[in-house]
Amino acid sequence: TDGMKLTLGDETLTLYLTPGHTEGTISTIIPLRDRGQKHVAAAWGGTLFNFGPNRPRIEAYHKSAERFREIAAKAGADVMLSNHTAYDGSKTKLPAVQNRKAGEKNPYVVGADGVKRYLTVVDECAQAALAGLT
């Protein structure tokens, strides 16, 4: 269910339906802690267009990206995660986190502007795909 809360231990995640990538795509707002500091992650569940020139699916993707961008902003998200490691930089960020020294910034913490930018770019990709349809 859209907006469903899922409690895992001491943390509660909020799940949102964000169809587009697939009809059942779910994106999540996740409260986090890193070295005692609180953060909020926006986990975008549907990064890729895997459906060809399908107007209804691309429109759903666009609406979902636009909506989740607003949800992430309201939640104060400052960490951006993707369901594909190539799209959130995890291939380089994971080793950096493992080797991080005291006082070094967590590379996953991109700030509210970084989260907004990521979700704006995926939305703009959907809009460009729509514009390219005949």
PLM features: residue spans?
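Metallo-beta-lactamase
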Residues: 3-8, 12-116
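C-terminal capping/extension segments of zinc metalloprotease domains
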Residues: 113-134
